[in-house]
Amino acid sequence: MNASGTFFFVVGPSGAGKDALMDGARAALDDNYVFARRVITRPEGAVGEAHEAVSEAEFARRQRSGEFLVTWDAHDLRYGLPCSLMSELERGRHVVANGSRAVIAELAQRLPRFVVVLVTAPQDVLARRIAARGRESGEQIARRVARTGAALPPEVRCLTVLNDSTLEVGRARFVEALRHGTRVASDGAPASRTNLMAKLRGEPLDQAAYVAVLQDAMAGRYTEAELTEFLVAATRSLDDQEVVALARARTVFTPRIKWDEPIVVDKHSIGGVPGSRITLIVVPIVAAYGLAMPKTSSRAITSAAGTADAMETVARVDLAHDDVRRCVAQARACIAWNGRLNHSVVDDVMNAITRPLRLDSRRWAVASILSKKYTAGATHVIVDLPYGPQTKLATRADAEALGAMFEHVGKGLGLHVRALVTDGSRPIGRGIGPALEVRDVRQVLANDPCAPADLREKALRFAGEIIAFDARVGSPAEGLRIATALLSEGKAKAAFDRIAATQGARPEPVAPGAHTCVVSATMQGRVAAIDGLRISGVARAAGAPRELGAGVDLLCTIGAKVESGQPLYRIHAGSDAALAAAAALARAGGECSEAVRIDPD
């Protein structure tokens, strides 16, 4: 059988949106692409894809007669792809079929031009989509999105499509993947293979070599096994100048945004500290001063809140490029979700490998982060590097070394980068979860005496450093003085309100969840530590960040004396069921039960 078309086998986790992307591709592609109609032992007209419904007996008969190319079982149903699809391949048409990872190896052995299309999305996006169906509880959803699919056979070609933005963006990425995939089997050995092999031997690559490897990787010309070897080698031998070369290579794939501004500011934090929502304070202070700060941020993946989740409690964050320009023109800044703005095809391919393997890819990440700041049009970048026992950087020395790397690579890209090492050993602020963190932010902006002092102090430090990027200011100390005045005089609050209004403010901010319970001390003593990972675990069990009002409100501070029975923190949730799940995790001896450690006096 001489099949000349390409067989695309689409897989991905629940909530990834495979069916929606395939529907869009069906309308966008020409007749040279055939979309398989699966045979399923499910009634005609049932919820789900259009399919050929058959009885169990009829399915078994067809299987015995050899009428299926492949079959599999899932969710108490039987699925099959008809052998007639081989005729389409022989005519040179490309087949697109939605299927199961379990049969990938079998199909790869039978089909000469076989490409897996892996549709994926961050866990928080998957969870929101599954929750919107209304068929599963929060706990069931959490378990579902935490599952990891079986590893793909190493010899199989795989194209990854990140579907974390709008349906329109997702469909465009999916269609582009299919078009790339038609060339995978016919291109032969990638032209950049000599570069890849050099990296496997530990040799440094220059910018041109990285461009060539990345182009072939994005086109699906390397197997997942080959890319894994490449990334493992890169994490072991990537010297300072090579990180600069990699960062420059990445900028080739995205045109740089042009701003008619002498200074365009951006900020990045490597995260890992619960609370610490300083961006929502820093940006309006900087905007009130007059510098342009088009800030784009991520949603949470494993934490209780991301900057975009927090801002979404007060305003729209899914801005397009024109919206960002309008916000900067009218309000000098924005705080937007980066899903529609800073998408990197390179990251789609590489993150699919580095995240499951938990590779120490910090140097690779520096190149990724700063290349995206460059293409976003930033001229000056400040980086927050918290260190502590539960952050990504264990020691101050680790943070200082990474800070030096950020500044070195930034210089290589023509950026002015300032990296600040900060204490990440404890939560900053009292709220953990989108609405609760924004409550703290609004207290700081309003100069409320109850505002968390640590949140205010850290935000002012970063705002002062950014304002000092303006040569007229002269020093970070003077920048801090200016930032403090802008905050104290209410100008930062006015700037925040203006930014929210320009983005599209909610009529009322999302309030903390109304379903609450308190976790109290079981002994007398002093608060010795607040475990950020465990306290975030309780907040996530309560529904954060999917439920914007869910989270934890800290009622104690490290070093404070507490009595037995004294409240330590309050859990907020959007439902009784979510509250019960979080409370059980906090109290029943689970991993989060010692979120606040008390030592006897």
Curated annotation (Swiss-Prot):
Reactions listed under catalytic activity: alpha-D-ribose 1,5-bisphosphate + ATP = 5-phospho-alpha-D-ribose 1-diphosphate + ADP; thymidine + phosphate = 2-deoxy-alpha-D-ribose 1-phosphate + thymine
Residue numbers binding ATP: G12, P13, S14, G15, A16, G17, K18, D19
Pfam families given in the database record: Glycos_transf_3 (PF00591), PYNP_C (PF07831)
Keyword annotations: ATP-binding, Glycosyltransferase, Nucleotide-binding, Transferase
E.C. designation(s): 2.7.4.23, 2.4.2.4
GO terms assigned for molecular function: 1,4-alpha-oligoglucan phosphorylase activity; ATP binding; ribose 1,5-bisphosphate phosphokinase activity; thymidine phosphorylase activity
Pathway where it operates: Metabolic intermediate biosynthesis; 5-phospho-alpha-D-ribose 1-diphosphate biosynthesis; 5-phospho-alpha-D-ribose 1-diphosphate from D-ribose 5-phosphate (route II): step 3/3
Assigned GO CC terms: cytosol
Name of this protein: Bifunctional ribose 1,5-bisphosphokinase-thymidine phosphorylase
Family per record: In the N-terminal section; belongs to the ribose 1,5-bisphosphokinase family. In the C-terminal section; belongs to the thymidine/pyrimidine-nucleoside phosphorylase family. Type 2 subfamily.
Major enzyme class: transferase
